[in-house]
């Protein structure tokens, strides 16, 4: 059957830049899915998404003009029950009537179990024009649009007003109506660089015509790549690098249809302001790309992406420089104003900054942070006084002008102001880094003082917010407790601190009776669950479960244990030992009395004597290996007792009639279990 490319374009007013790429991809995928379900393409649809500030479009290859005819088989009652005394039963008559057929038109087919009556017919395929309108409308409804709007006198809703609809199959217009618009082959190009309507000649020529006639690079990916290439080229020319993240590049790509990268600058005296402030205002407010020199220092040059191409771009450059100058002047003013007061002198203002109405102000919180940070610093062997001082100043920049304007700079500005106040570099760095890690993959704090304050901050948040009942549920976690827990875990995996003891320290820093008394145990369980999530990114679930079943309170050796268990699992004896361990644990659950020492005089059979001797020899080897952190050695030693374990279970009845003998054998198995599970619960391997 003849196929051609299908093109659909929605011409809109300027779409939300942060959502544009997502909207374009969703629209294209939904259209493709609709075509697949309607069997207008063979197999998976091959499509290209287009998204620019004023349009969403999709191009789908090999779309049929008409569905293929389908053979339909409607199955009815079993032959055995369909006729009575040579006449059709009511069941058969009802089936024929429902199928719109006569009895004589029915056939007999086998349904896999029995012969049944059936009505077979050919359903003629519908043309693309009859199906496409519903497919497009369904795709529009599926778009992830949090807020919709109406325009003019229309009752239709969309993320922005829609003014044009192009629908072409090859070179033919497919007549459909979507959002109150009738399809055509007419669209508009760039708002300023293109003149009049553009007639799309063929679905395949869309991108080329938009580029050549409309001055529009319709592909989001192509525009983004062009911008990135131009930015990097300009930066190389200036012996610089571009300070930009993926989010800024995506947003700028969504703001332009014909990107032109230009170089501009600002007065050098602004560089006296901390570069983080300047970079943030350039990126966040102006969508500019700052430039860094070879030492990572901000230059007084920057790159901007214009949506206009002119022979003389100087007026565009001057206009952008003028706007930025005003922004940087504000930042410079805030910085100078903030220097008129020390961080210490700002602390009283934190009494009026509410952290949470149930657990007080930021000033009250600072008191807790000081005590927790000092405690952790002592445990780390760090300067407790420095940690306490850093914790005292950690939140002071929240009441500065700069952080009031740019909340993202909290901590960063605290570092600069701490330096200006004469605080040590260790304290200044800790003030900045106590928010780290802010997100998955973020850097951990440098040094023990910064780590102590960062741990204190996250522990106080986790325990305090949890303790007043604001527990994360589903996708709701307004105080980011999951993120705080992961940050704590990542830090503790570097240091040998007891996680439960730290939780208790944080809990004790709150006034007695303020928090739920179950908070320490509940948050410890929560941390254990988050640790499993973190580790399962790199290790199989059964290995993680085996290690965490021991409920490790020190996390600095967890990775070594995981690696050891992973190596043990590869041993030929591992599966049998894991099964034996599981059997041992099940038997131990049946013990009537408390388990104790093995009485050698009650060992009757050679197999249990041999196992006891093997366990006796194994115990010091495993204890020494575990003490030295050689977990792989400890686990590999288990392989040596497999023959004795197998022989024991083959020849010894553990649950003997003699109560003393039974208890002694359970004591022996308990001793074996302690050694087998010294590193991890190996019974969980393979589950």
UniProtKB/Swiss-Prot annotation:
It is found in: Cytoplasm. One of its GO terms (molecular function) is glycine-tRNA ligase activity. The keyword ATP-binding applies. Keywords: Aminoacyl-tRNA synthetase, ATP-binding, Cytoplasm, Ligase, Nucleotide-binding, Protein biosynthesis. It is an enzyme of class 6 (ligase). PROSITE patterns: AA_TRNA_LIGASE_II_GLYAB (PS50861). GO terms for cellular component: cytosol. InterPro entries: DALR_anticod-bd (IPR008909), Gly-tRNA-synth_bsu (IPR015944), Gly-tRNA-synth_heterodimer (IPR006194). SUPFAM superfamilies: HD-domain/PDEase-like. The keyword Cytoplasm applies. It holds the Pfam family tRNA_synt_2f. GO terms for biological process: arginyl-tRNA aminoacylation; glycyl-tRNA aminoacylation. It catalyses: tRNA(Gly) + glycine + ATP = glycyl-tRNA(Gly) + AMP + diphosphate. Its EC number is 6.1.1.14. Tetramer of two alpha and two beta subunits. Belongs to the class-II aminoacyl-tRNA synthetase family. This is Glycine--tRNA ligase beta subunit. It comes from Neisseria meningitidis serogroup C (strain 053442). The gene is glyS.
């Amino acid at each position: 059957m003849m196929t051609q490319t299908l093109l659909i374009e929605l011409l809109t007013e300027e779409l939300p830049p942060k959502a544009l790429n997502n909207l374009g991809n969703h629209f294209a995928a939904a259209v493709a899915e609709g075509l697949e379900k309607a069997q207008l393409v063979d197999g998976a649809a091959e499509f290209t998404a287009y998204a620019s500030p004023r349009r969403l479009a999709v191009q789908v290859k090999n779309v049929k003009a008409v569905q293929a005819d389908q053979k339909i088989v409607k199955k009815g009652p079993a032959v055995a029950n369909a006729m009575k005394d040579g006449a059709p039963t009511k069941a058969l008559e009802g089936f024929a009537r429902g199928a719109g057929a006569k009895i004589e038109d029915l056939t007999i087919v086998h349904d896999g179990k029995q012969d049944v009556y059936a009505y077979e017919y050919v359903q003629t395929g519908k043309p693309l024009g009859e199906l496409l309108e519903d497919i497009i409308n369904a795709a529009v409804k599926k778009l992830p649009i949090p807020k919709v709007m109406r325009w003019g006198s229309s009752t239709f809703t969309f993320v922005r007003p829609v003014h044009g609809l192009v629908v072409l199959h090859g070179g033919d217009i497919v007549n459909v109506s979507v959002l109150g618009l009738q399809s055509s082959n007419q669209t508009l190009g760039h708002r300023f660089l293109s003149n009049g309507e553009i007639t799309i000649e063929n679905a395949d020529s869309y991108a080329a015509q938009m580029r050549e006639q409309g001055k529009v690079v319709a592909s989001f990916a192509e525009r983004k790549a062009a911008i990135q290439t131009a930015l990097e080229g300009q930066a190389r020319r200036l012996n610089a690098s571009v300070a930009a993240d993926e989010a800024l590049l995506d947003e700028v790509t969504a703001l332009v249809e014909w990107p032109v990268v230009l170089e501009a600058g600002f007065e050098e005296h602004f560089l006296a302001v901390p570069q983080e402030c300047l970079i943030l205002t350039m990126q966040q407010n102006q969508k500019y790309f700052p430039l860094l020199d070879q030492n990572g220092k901000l230059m007084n040059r920057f790159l901007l992406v214009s949506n206009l191409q002119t022979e003389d771009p100087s007026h565009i450059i001057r206009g952008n420089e003028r706007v930025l100058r005003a922004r940087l002047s504000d930042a410079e003013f805030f910085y100078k104003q903030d220097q008129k007061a020390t961080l210490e002198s700002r602390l009283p203002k934190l009494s009026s900054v509410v952290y949470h109405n149930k657990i007080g102000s930021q000033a009250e919180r600072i008191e807790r942070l000081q005590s927790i940070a000092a405690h952790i610093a002592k445990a780390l062997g760090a300067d407790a006084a420095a940690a306490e001082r850093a914790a005292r100043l950690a939140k002071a920049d929240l009441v500065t002008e700069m952080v009031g304007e740019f909340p993202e700079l909290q901590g960063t500005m605290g570092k600069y102001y701490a330096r200006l106040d004469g605080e040590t570099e260790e304290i200044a760095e800790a003030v900045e880094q106590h928010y780290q890690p802010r997100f998955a993959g973020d850097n951990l704090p440098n040094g023990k003082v910064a780590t102590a304050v960062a741990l204190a901050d996250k522990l106080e948040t986790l325990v305090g917010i949890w303790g007043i009942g604001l527990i994360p549920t589903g996708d709701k976690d307004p105080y980011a407790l999951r993120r705080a827990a992961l940050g704590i875990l990542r830090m503790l995996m570097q240091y040998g601190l007891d996680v439960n003891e730290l939780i208790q320290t944080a809990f004790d820093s709150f006034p007695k009776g303020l928090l739920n008394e179950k908070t320490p145990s509940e948050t410890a369980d929560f941390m254990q669950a988050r640790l499993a999530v973190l580790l399962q990114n790199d290790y199989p679930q059964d290995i993680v479960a085996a290690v965490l079943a021991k409920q490790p309170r020190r996390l600095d050796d967890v990775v070594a244990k995981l690696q050891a268990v992973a190596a043990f699992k590869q041993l030929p004896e591992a599966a049998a030992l894991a099964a034996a361990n599981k059997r041992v644990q099940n038997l131990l659950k049946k013990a009537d009395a408390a388990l104790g020492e093995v009485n050698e005089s009650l060992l009757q059979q050679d197999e249990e004597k041999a196992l006891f001797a093997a366990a006796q020899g194994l115990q010091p080897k495993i204890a020494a290996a575990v003490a030295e952190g050689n977990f792989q050695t400890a686990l590999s030693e288990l392989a040596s007792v497999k023959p004795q374990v197998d022989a024991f279970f083959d020849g010894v009845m553990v649950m003997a009639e003699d109560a003393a003998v039974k208890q002694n054998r359970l004591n022996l198995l308990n001793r074996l279990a302690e050694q087998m599970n010294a590193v991890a619960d190996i019974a969980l391997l393979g589950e």
